[in-house]
Regions:
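Carbohydrate-associated surface elements
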Residues: 195
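Non-catalytic beta-strand/loop surface segments
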Residues: 1-40, 62-98, 133-187, 211-259, ...
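C-terminal, helix-dominated tail/subdomain
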Residues: 377-388, 396
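Short alpha-helical scaffolding segments that buttress acidic/His motifs in well-ordered protein cores
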Residues: 52, 102, 106, 146, ...
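A common structural junction motif
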Residues: 107-117, 208-216, 336-347
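Active-site SXXK
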Residues: 47-60
Length: 430
């Protein structure tokens, strides 16, 4: 993506606006990103960012509950929202001539969400039901336990969806205070991509957003995760169909100089993914090392790695679903062996070239749709800077085989790892 075509504009109230014209189709997308996620939650209020996201689909005086669904569908558009560790985002993708509708919706709910008590209680039920559905998946139990074990000081310790005890206790006032604190123009990024003229669309942005008042300074963030002092292990025993293994290593944030080599390492192990780092969790690249070593040999039903960008140091993880004739301990050994091979022998130039080609294909795919372009720009702006979209491409292209070996030796060590096993209880195996 050429940043020459991305324009940055900041309103007096602090709202950052990124625009990119894309005239290949008569479509435009409107995204608003807030710099708030589970990273900004304290004990007792876990899951509150995700719950607030739900509440913003429950109406304002201008757009009552249910109207949003109808008006966007009537105009041939799509919409959604999501919450992650470091951010919350909302979007509407519409025919280009109806982009103004997205601006109306997002400027309105930035300040006018109702948080009606009856809707708070309804969403409490919805969110708890979502949590219970999440807990029905063994891999989620294991992942939550591994991450909680990996982090002792940083709020990344907590699941984005929250703990049930907190979801039962959070009040309407808690939710509204969180909303009033973080949903302000000076804590938001508006990203517009599509078939429009920049000057004209900026006039509309100023019409809808310029009069919104900025918020007070955000609560300070002090948490720093201490360096790990040795391997930790956790075992989860619950109903399930098969044993699972997750190995997580504390790894650098996305602004670190070693981020690009670690992205390449992830691609070597599991295949390239888009620079939005969305998706994952299933094996898609049959030539990747983990697939060849664990799936082709019928040790595991799937085996993947994952390394996603985060504002603060998070994890580089390996996951595998064990075939019923094998044990988690065998799969752990096989996963660690693949890491040790890279640490000891490195990777070949040809392997790096293959991964580079895969990454270029994923990047090209990311640029195909206006929604993906906005996702890419917004993700990187809230984590670091939208300019990283260009610089990261250059960083990835500059990675050498010895860089991949070095980061494997530096970060994927016993000292920095948490090993998790999921062992099905006997009753679930019949």
């Amino acid at each position: 993506m050429s940043l020459d075509s991305v324009h940055s504009h900041t309103l007096p109230n602090g709202l950052l606006v990124l625009t990119k014209e894309a005239h290949s189709a008569p479509i435009a997308t409107c995204w608003v990103w807030y710099r708030v996620g589970s990273r900004n939650e304290r004990s007792g209020l876990t899951g509150i960012s995700h719950w607030v996201e739900h509440m913003l689909f429950n109406g304002t005086p201008t757009f009552p509950k249910g109207y949003l669904d109808r008006v966007i569908a009537r105009n041939g558009g799509t919409f959604n929202g999501f919450t992650w560790l470091d951010y919350t985002a909302y979007f509407e993708t519409l025919p280009a001539e109806r982009l103004e509708l997205g601006l109306q919706i997002e400027s309105d709910r930035m300040v006018n969400a109702l948080f009606l008590p009856e809707e708070v209680e309804r969403e409490r039920t919805v969110v708890i039901s979502e949590l219970e559905g999440y807990e029905n998946q063994p891999e989620n139990w294991l992942s939550e336990a591994v991450v909680a074990t990996a982090f002792v000081a940083h709020p990344y310790h907590n699941p984005v969806i929250g703990y049930k005890s907190d979801l039962l206790a959070i009040t309407r006032d808690d939710l509204y205070l969180h909303y009033q604190t973080y949903y302000k123009p000076n804590n938001a990024v508006l990203v517009l991509v599509g078939d429009f003229e920049t000057d004209a669309v900026l006039q509309k942005v100023e019409h809808y957003f310029a009069d919104l008042p900025p918020g007070l300074p955000l609560p300070p963030f002090y948490a720093v995760e201490p360096e790990p002092q040795g391997e930790k292990r956790v075992t989860i025993r619950r109903p399930g169909a098969a044993e699972q293994v997750q190995i997580a290593y504390l790894a650098p944030d996305c602004r670190h100089a070693d981020f690009a080599p670690l992205v390449i390492l992830d691609a070597v192990l599991s295949g390239a993914r888009p620079l939005t780092f969305s998706g994952g969790g299933t094996q898609t690249n049959r030539s990747a090392r983990l697939y060849q070593a664990l799936v082709e040999t019928q040790l595991a039903n799937y085996a993947v790695s994952s390394y996603r960008p985060s504002r603060d140091p998070f994890i580089f993880e390996l996951d595998a679903l064990v075939r019923t004739e094998h044990k988690a301990s065998e799969i752990e050994t096989a996963l660690l062996h693949e890491i040790e091979k890279i640490q000891n022998d490195g990777i070949k130039v040809e392997e790096l070239a293959k991964v580079d080609k895969q990454l270029r294909a994923q990047i090209a795919y990311s640029y195909e749709r206006v929604t993906n372009q906005a996702l890419l720009l917004g993700t990187w702006e809230v984590l670091a800077s939208f300019k990283r979209v260009d610089t990261l491409f250059d960083e990835l292209a500059a990675v050498k085989p010895e860089d991949v070996q070095r980061v494997a030796q530096t970060y994927l060590t016993e000292m920095r790892r948490v090993v998790g096993h999921f062992i099905p209880t006997k009753s679930s195996l019949g």
